[in-house]
């Protein structure tokens, strides 16, 4: 049985989580924790958040029965939670709206963020434009190449995009640079972390803002079918879209829960981003969790066709859910994700993000082992517009 009161007062999910940061950041994190504790149950704050999610983000978004996909596969009925229909095209805005409202109440004038696929950067730049914050987004130079359209969107929204050329030039390096910035500008700056990783209180706070996904999906599935789903499936990079769907179902033992990591070119090749499946516990970006690292504890380079899953760690709550066995973690490789990307597009007229395609791919495998009376909710965490250049290049087409 999952204890719903996690994390504890120190930000621990069992042996994971915590606040492993330089002394210079402790007071900023404590200030943030105090503000979040104050406002998370404040009716004015929650009312404003609800209004923004409804009128600006476009919630609730639908739970869509993918009839044609389900029929083609045979087996369980697949339902898609349509986070791709949110303003900005992914689940990321659920969290950035929440953190922006908190930053406003804390009197901050500047927001910073890290981004991989660019979706969190776009969602942060969007709320910065809306609420009048100065905005700086750190992005690995490798990801800037892969996600040029999102880079332009951020600049259009008024954000400064800073290329990060250290390390593997991807998400983990962008996170390092953002943390360095925050240390230097703690008085006026709010760091909007995009996933359920990082030091306490971020894993809890981001989970709480993303839990709207599961709250809605649960009610929508009950309304459509009169019962709970048999399984949930979501992709896991840092893990915020997944924990958002999973959290409201954790105590429902009849619901099987699957997190899907990026298997890249195959786990056996070492070129992947599956930290829960192939990693071991360690400390990265302020929290203890599962990491991909070598025998000397150095963080390994990761690979995925999807920039948003290309991260060597994972949120600490996922590490805890793996160890307790409540969530089962699987890997889907690049080619399987691309096949699912094409199949969903062809059968339903919905172009998913490559991240979400990993979840769709595993749901397809799972559905085949289940009966037609059973159902699976897949978190369609984002739309695939941002991935057109990547998929076209794989197909040998230049656009």
UniProtKB/Swiss-Prot annotation:
<dbReference type="InterPro" id="IPR006654">
    <property type="entry name" value="Trp_synth_beta"/>
</dbReference>
<keyword id="KW-0456">Lyase</keyword>
<keyword id="KW-0057">Aromatic amino acid biosynthesis</keyword>
<dbReference type="GO" id="GO:0004834">
    <property type="term" value="F:tryptophan synthase activity"/>
</dbReference>
<dbReference type="InterPro" id="IPR006653">
    <property type="entry name" value="Trp_synth_b_CS"/>
</dbReference>
<dbReference type="InterPro" id="IPR036052">
    <property type="entry name" value="TrpB-like_PALP_sf"/>
</dbReference>
<protein>
    <recommendedName>
        <fullName>Tryptophan synthase beta chain</fullName>
        <ecNumber>4.2.1.20</ecNumber>
    </recommendedName>
</protein>
<comment type="function">
    <text>The beta subunit is responsible for the synthesis of L-tryptophan from indole and L-serine.</text>
</comment>
<dbReference type="InterPro" id="IPR001926">
    <property type="entry name" value="TrpB-like_PALP"/>
</dbReference>
<comment type="pathway">
    <text>Amino-acid biosynthesis; L-tryptophan biosynthesis; L-tryptophan from chorismate: step 5/5.</text>
</comment>
<comment type="subunit">
    <text>Tetramer of two alpha and two beta chains.</text>
</comment>
<keyword id="KW-0663">Pyridoxal phosphate</keyword>
<dbReference type="InterPro" id="IPR023026">
    <property type="entry name" value="Trp_synth_beta/beta-like"/>
</dbReference>
<keyword id="KW-0822">Tryptophan biosynthesis</keyword>
<dbReference type="GO" id="GO:0005737">
    <property type="term" value="C:cytoplasm"/>
</dbReference>
<feature type="modified residue" description="N6-(pyridoxal phosphate)lysine">
    <location>
        <position position="92"/>
    </location>
</feature>
<dbReference type="Pfam" id="PF00291">
    <property type="entry name" value="PALP"/>
</dbReference>
<keyword id="KW-0028">Amino-acid biosynthesis</keyword>
<comment type="similarity">
    <text>Belongs to the TrpB family.</text>
</comment>
């Amino acid at each position: 049985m999952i204890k719903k009161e996690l994390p504890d007062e120190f930000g621990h999910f069992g042996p994971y989580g915590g606040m492993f940061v330089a002394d210079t950041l402790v007071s900023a994190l404590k200030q943030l924790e105090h503000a979040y504790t104050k406002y998370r149950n404040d009716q004015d704050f929650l009312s404003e958040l609800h209004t923004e999610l409804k009128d600006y983000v476009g919630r609730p978004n639908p739970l869509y029965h993918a009839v044609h996909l389900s029929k083609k596969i045979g087996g369980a009925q697949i339902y898609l939670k349509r986070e791709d229909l949110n303003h900005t095209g992914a689940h990321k805005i659920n969290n950035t709206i929440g953190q922006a409202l908190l930053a406003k109440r804390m009197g901050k004038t500047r927001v910073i963020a890290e981004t991989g696929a660019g979706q969190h950067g776009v969602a942060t730049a969007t709320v910065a434009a809306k609420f009048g914050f100065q905005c700086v987004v750190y992005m690995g130079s490798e990801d800037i190449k892969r996600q040029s359209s999102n880079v332009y969107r951020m600049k259009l929204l008024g954000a400064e995009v800073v290329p990060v050329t250290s390390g593997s030039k991807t998400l983990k390096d962008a996170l390092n640079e953002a943390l360095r910035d925050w240390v230097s500008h703690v008085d006026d700056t709010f760091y909007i972390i995009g996933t359920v990783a990082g030091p306490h209180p971020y894993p809890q706070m981001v989970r709480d803002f993303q839990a709207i996904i599961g709250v809605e999906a649960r009610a929508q599935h009950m309304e459509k079918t009169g019962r709970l789903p048999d399984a949930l499936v979501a992709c896991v990079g840092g893990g915020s879209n997944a924990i958002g769907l999973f959290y409201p179902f954790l105590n429902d033992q009849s619901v099987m829960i699957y997190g899907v990591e990026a298997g890249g070119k195959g786990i056996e090749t070492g070129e992947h981003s599956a930290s829960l499946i192939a990693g071991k516990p360690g400390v990265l970006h302020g929290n203890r969790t599962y990491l991909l690292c070598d025998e000397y504890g150095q963080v390994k380079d990761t690979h995925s066709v999807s920039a948003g899953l290309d991260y060597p760690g994972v949120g600490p709550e996922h590490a805890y859910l793996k160890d307790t066995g409540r969530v089962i973690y699987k890997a889907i490789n690049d080619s399987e994700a691309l096949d699912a990307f094409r199949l969903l597009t062809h059968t339903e007229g919905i172009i998913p993000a490559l991240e979400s395609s990993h979840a769709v791919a595993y749901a397809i495998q799972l559905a085949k082992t289940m009966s037609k009376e059973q159902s699976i909710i897949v978190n369609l965490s984002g739309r695939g517009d941002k991935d057109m250049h990547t998929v076209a290049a794989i197909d040998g087409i230049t656009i």
